Each structure stands twice: as structure tokens, then as C-alpha cells.
């Protein structure tokens, strides 16, 4: 939110709500991004008691392909230990990158592999689990750098920047341009989708992702057939649509776009 407010402040007087509205409307952004700017400005207006009529933008449905684990791992395998560990934690846990940046050593149980993140977006608290290989990497990283329980492990901005550079480099090196399309946030999509695929439990998936409202989990529901080499995706706009596709042999998988 702060980043969006700073962007607006560089381009328009935030105390002039009509100018802000005109500026946002004039930009060549998606309605979804414009709506995010509006939401950020609404917080500013409430804080400074500025009266204005909030414009409405209709978010367009956009399908993002869930990356394959083998493609995620291709990128991770070329990262240095610090970042390979960070990416593996995201892949295993489905945390948001911003939540990763708040983790301290004390937030990990180095015996069980349990993780106790601070949930972003006022979400519900949860306990997550790392794979044994990821836990081993984490222990090595902590030992190699003599980290103490209160040390922060990663900075979100640097993790994002490193992922952006790394995927471009690996996509070029392996001559697999589709790797360049995998965003860091897609690791959360992968983890959420696989959690539902394995459990068939939307409530468990909601808690896994740290949502308080199941509507957030169901906001973007995709049905993916994992039995094929390439995922076949069909969008379900209602629960009835979802049930019909399940009857056709699809697996019901949660796919999040936040």
C-alpha cells in the first residue's frame, strides 16, 4: 500500500481527491491495478478525513498457469544457498514473499521443520511445514552464517530481485523461455494448488494460505487435470460450474491471484 501511495504522490497532489481520480483514470493500467491504487488512496483519505466518491473498476479475470515443480526446481538449483533456501521455503510453505522477509531464525523449529510465520494482510495465523531437504539447507545456511535466534534471514526486496535476474539467466542458459514467465509469487500458487490437490479440503487449504475468509480462497478457483503432462485449465465462475467440471474428471484445485 505504501509503495502505491508513494507512486501517486510523485505524480499528483494526494490532498486533491479529484486530481487523484483523474490521474488514475488517465493511466494505461489494468482495471485491477487501478483498483489497487484506489484502495491504497482510500486508506490515505480515511486517515486524513478527506471526503471523496470512490470510483469503481471491474477486475478482469486473468488465468495464470501454475508452474510445474520441475521448472521451479530448475531455477532453485542454480541459486546460491541463501536464495535457494529462501525459494525452497516459499515452494514448500506457500508463504507470501513479504512474509518470508519477516522470518527470524526463532520462527523455525529446526527439529521438526515447522515454520511459524507472521501472516500478512491481517490473515489468520498458521503453522507450516518444510520438506526434509529444505530443512537441511536451512540448517546449513544458519550454521554457515552464525545466525542467532533473532536474526532476520532474508530481505524480501533482494529475494525478489535475485529471482528476477536468476530466472532470466537460467531461461537463456537452458533455452527454456517459459521459465522466465514464473514469478516468485507463483510459488505460492503452486503450493496452494498442490495442497488442495493432495487434501481435497478447501478449509484446510484456506488455513494453509492464511485466509480468514473462504471467499478469498475461492476468489480464483481453477480446475486442473494433473494427470496430463501439461495442465489443462478450465475456469469455474460459480460452485455449480466447479461441480460440473469435477464430474468430468478434473481435480478441484485452489488457485490464488492476490
Give the residues covered by each predicted segment:
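DNA/chromatin major-groove-contacting recognition/catalytic segments
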Residues: 129-132, 136, 141, 207, ...
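Active-site-proximal segment of tyrosine recombinases
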Residues: 99-100, 182-183, 192-195, 200-211
Amino acid at each position: 500500500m505504501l509503495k502505491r501511495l508513494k507512486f501517486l504522490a510523485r505524480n499528483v497532489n494526494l490532498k486533491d481527491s479529484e486530481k487523484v481520480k483523474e490521474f488514475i483514470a488517465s493511466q494505461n493500467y489494468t482495471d485491477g491495478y487501478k483498483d489497487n491504487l484506489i484502495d491504497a488512496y482510500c486508506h490515505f483519505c480515511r486517515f486524513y478525513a478527506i471526503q471523496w466518491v470512490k470510483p469503481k473498476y471491474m477486475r478482469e479475470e486473468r488465468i495464470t498457469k501454475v508452474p510445474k515443480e520441475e521448472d521451479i526446481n530448475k531455477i532453485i538449483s542454480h541459486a546460491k544457498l541463501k536464495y535457494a533456501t529462501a525459494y525452497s521455503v516459499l515452494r514448500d510453505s506457500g508463504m507470501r514473499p513479504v512474509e518470508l522477509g519477516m522470518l527470524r531464525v526463532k520462527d523455525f523449529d529446526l527439529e521438526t521443520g515447522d515454520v511459524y510465520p507472521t501472516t500478512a494482510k491481517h490473515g489468520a495465523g498458521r503453522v507450516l511445514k518444510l520438506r526434509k531437504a529444505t530443512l537441511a539447507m536451512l540448517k546449513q545456511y544458519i550454521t554457515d552464517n552464525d545466525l542467532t535466534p533473532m536474526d532476520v534471514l532474508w530481505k524480501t526486496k533482494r529475494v525478489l530481485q535475485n529471482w528476477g535476474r536468476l530466472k532470466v539467466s537460467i531461461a537463456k542458459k537452458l533455452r527454456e523461455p517459459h521459465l522466465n514467465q514464473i514469478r516468485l509469487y507463483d510459488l505460492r500458487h503452486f503450493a496452494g494448488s498442490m495442497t488442495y490437490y493432495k487434501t481435497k479440503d478447501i478449509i484446510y487449504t484456506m488455513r494453509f494460505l492464511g485466509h480468514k475468509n473462504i471467499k478469498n480462497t475461492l476468489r480464483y478457483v481453477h480446475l486442473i487435470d494433473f494427470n496430463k503432462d501439461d495442465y489443462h485449465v478450465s475456469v469455474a465462475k460459480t460452485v455449480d460450474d466447479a461441480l460440473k467440471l469435477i464430474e468430468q474428471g478434473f481435480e478441484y484445485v485452489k488457485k490464488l491471484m492476490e
